[in-house]
A protein has these predicted regions:
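Bacterial Sec signal peptide processing site at the extreme N-terminus
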Residues: 14-39
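Sec-dependent bacterial lipoprotein signal peptides
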Residues: 1-20
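Mixed-charge, low-complexity intrinsically disordered segments
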Residues: 107-161
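Compositionally biased P/S/T/G-rich terminal and signal peptide-adjacent segments
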Residues: 31-71
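C-terminal partner/receptor-binding element of secreted or periplasmic proteins
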Residues: 45-49, 148-175
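Short, well-ordered alpha-helical segments
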Residues: 70-112
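Soluble periplasmic/extracytoplasmic beta-strand elements of cell-envelope proteins
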Residues: 52-54, 66-73, 98-102, 168-170
Length: 175
């Protein structure tokens, strides 16, 4: 009986606390919250400074292995150069030799710059599987219109995206 009362009391306290802005912490504490996708949990490599960019899987080297699958949330009013700088900084920190950029959509919310990491559980050769873009599907489907972001926009200071964006990205090691 005493254990039941304690459990009910703990549940009441947790419900009360969750309404005070601590909902995510409480959910995680009791096992209801998911993983924090902004925390990179993959293979750790030495940082790199020279990173090749590809917009098509056919442009990726045959020896390149995918070690990070990410949806990148970009804030509004970014230039092509801002996007390039943000992406290359993160990819370099993670040790990428090459980055394959998938499609881009207008973001429904402006959450600032965030890299949401979905895996993979094990590295895989890009030539075998790249281009499927199956990770983060629920979030991806909830986004807005398609946005063109390719070689003509990449790295350009004169190209500005007024809305937040969500971009598909995989990071690769090619050594």
């Amino acid at each position: 009986m005493l254990k039941t009362v304690r459990c009910i009391l703990v549940a009441v306290v947790l419900v009360a606390v969750s309404g005070c802005g601590a909902g995510k912490s409480v959910k995680k504490l009791v096992g209801l919250g998911g993983d924090d996708l902004t925390v990179y949990k993959g293979q750790v490599y030495p940082a790199t400074s020279k990173i090749a960019i590809a917009f098509q899987p056919a442009q990726v080297g045959k020896s390149c292995r995918v070690f990070a699958e990410s949806l990148v949330l970009l804030p509004a009013n970014q230039t092509g150069k801002d996007i390039e700088n943000s992406l290359l900084a993160e990819a370099g920190q993670r040790g990428a030799d090459q980055v394959l950029i998938g499609q881009t959509r207008q973001g429904e919310d402006d959450a600032g710059l965030q890299f949401l990491y979905y895996g993979p559980t094990y590295e895989y050769l890009c030539v075998d599987q790249c281009g499927g873009w199956k990770f983060g599907y629920k979030l991806w489907e909830a986004q807005g219109e398609w946005v063109t972001l390719g070689y003509n926009e990449w790295g350009k200071t004169g190209v500005r995206f007024e809305t937040p964006l969500v971009m598909q990205v995989v990071m690769l090691r090619c050594q």
